Regions:
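C-terminal motif of bacterial Sec signal peptides marking the signal peptidase cleavage site
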Residues: 18-20
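Beta/coil-rich, acidic/histidine-enriched accessory regions frequently appended to metallopeptidases
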Residues: 22-27, 33, 37, 41-46, ...
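Zinc-dependent metallopeptidase catalytic helix centered on the HExxH motif
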Residues: 43-80, 240-347
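Juxtacatalytic substrate-recognition/specificity segment
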Residues: 43-59, 174-270
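Solvent-exposed, acidic/flexible segments
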Residues: 56-64, 102-110, 118, 122, ...
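Sec-exported extracytoplasmic/periplasmic mature domains
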Residues: 52-55, 71-76, 114-122, 130-134, ...
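Positively charged n-region of N-terminal signal peptides that target proteins for export
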Residues: 1-7
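Active-site-proximal alpha-helical
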Residues: 66, 70-71, 84-137, 307-421
Length: 433
């Protein structure tokens, strides 16, 4: 019996000892158990990618810069390159530059990327708002006392472009539903079109917002795609194919005019009305600042005598420029800024000078040149500026809603209470008052 009790006692002792080895003592609430100093970490967590933010960027220059940086490629010192001010254009680094001149663009991309990343970090590389500032700082780091002069709003907008290329169009540049097709940049560089792309596109967006917010878009497809084919064939004429809305552009000031045609102003029975409406929205309301700037440049050149020699030799075009300047400024027109430029005064001056000189190309003549067929529409004897001046007169006296109603119905007399000839007589009386 004694042996049996001893055996049981031994078993109880072993059980107690084993329990003390395997059970964790009770710990205070919310307290983690201690870990052994000799425990082994078996985690397989992947280290964070320092360039993760940048890999998702669709900007081409960032891709080139990142690839060089990851491969520890030594960047070029571009002080001599940028000492030539003509090369400042390469610092824009918009996507189409890598098609235009990859050899010069890639080293710039690599150097700028390394400068911004090293000094400001990954987020700064993507910061469009401060990018102009960073580019100026980069130039200073080269020992150059020069600022990067691109306007921040232009920089941000053009950096948002979608770019592609094909065998027909070397440069296809899109901003949302607006696309420009260039076979080439004619004799110039991409930079000369940056202002055009910015002001033309933002002006179109502003014009559409204006139509929509003022309930003037009845019958107009303001949500359509706008495709501009930049033909530059030397004719100076623009054309919108009414069947599909594609626009063929020779004059950069006419993109908004043609967009109004593409949206639905296509009836030509009263050609003066359709063309006048397109110019009213596309030019007169000032959505594209470059149009005012181009007119002001002509007036300033006339003021400074640049056209005197040609005008004195009998060149009709230069005589017209000088007379428009005299008419516009005599009636109080200003040419000191786009904000004070008076489109209405300028258009009326242009119409008067044309009528007085009796030297202008009519709507009918232009229609025949573009469409290869005669035009017998009402108002085809007017010029574009004369038709626009007439529409402006009607807007002042009847309102734009009535003008659009007349276009939609093509019933001029019912809408205005007068026919075309009577309205034209009233307009001429106003013009020469």
């Amino acid at each position: 019996m004694k042996t049996k009790l001893s055996f049981i006692a031994i078993l109880l002792l072993i059980t107690m000892l084993l329990g003390s080895c395997t059970n964790t003592p009770d710990l205070p609430e919310n307290t983690e158990p201690p870990t052994s100093d000799n425990s082994t970490d078996t985690s397989t967590e992947t280290p964070e990618d320092p360039f993760g933010l940048l890999r998702s960027s669709e900007e081409e220059w960032i891709s080139y810069g990142l690839a060089a940086y990851e491969n520890d490629k030594e960047v070029e010192n571009l002080k001599d390159f940028f000492s030539d001010r003509a090369n400042m254009t390469y610092l824009t680094l918009y996507d189409h530059f890598f098609t235009y001149d990859k050899t010069k663009s890639v080293p710039v991309a690599e150097a700028l990327f390394a400068f911004i990343y090293d000094k400001y970090g990954a987020e700064a590389v993507l910061d469009l708002v401060k990018r102009c500032e960073y580019k100026s700082e980069y130039l200073k780091s080269l020992g150059l006392e020069v600022e990067y002069t691109n306007a921040p709003e232009v920089e941000v907008f053009l950096a948002s472009m979608d770019f592609s290329s094909n065998s027909t169009y070397k440069y296809i540049i899109s901003f949302g539903n607006v696309t420009y097709y260039f076979k080439d940049f004619s004799a110039g560089s991409p930079t000369q079109y940056h202002g055009f792309l910015y002001y033309s596109t933002t002006g179109l967006f502003e014009m559409i917002d204006y139509l929509k917010s003022n309930n003037l878009n009845e019958g107009l497809d303001i949500e359509r795609k706008f495709n501009y084919y930049m033909t530059f064939d030397g004719s100076g004429y623009n054309k919108t194919v009414y069947a599909n809305g594609n626009m063929y552009i020779n004059d950069s000031n006419s993109t908004l005019h043609e967009a109004v045609h593409a949206m639905g102003i296509t009836k030509n029975d009263n050609i003066w009305l359709s063309e006048g409406i397109c110019n009213y929205f596309g030019k007169q309301l000032g959505f594209n600042d470059q149009i005012a700037a181009s007119y002001m440049q002509l007036l300033t050149m006339a003021k400074q005598g640049y056209f005197d020699e040609q005008a004195n030799a009998g060149n009709a075009q230069y005589i017209l420029y000088k007379r428009v300047y005299e008419d516009y400024t005599t009636r109080g027109g200003k040419i000191d800024s786009v904000d004070t430029f008076d489109f209405r005064l300028y258009t009326d001056a242009h119409a008067r000078v044309e009528l007085d000189a009796n030297t202008y190309r009519t709507l009918g003549e232009v229609y025949k040149l573009v469409n290869k067929t005669d035009c017998n529409a009402v108002g085809n004897e007017l010029s574009y500026d004369q038709a626009t001046s007439l529409v402006l007169y009607l807007v002042d006296n009847y309102g734009i809603e009535k003008v659009l109603e007349a276009y939609r119905s093509q019933d001029i007399e019912t809408v205005f209470g007068k026919g075309y000839q009577d309205l034209k007589t009233d307009w001429l009386a106003y013009l020469y008052n």
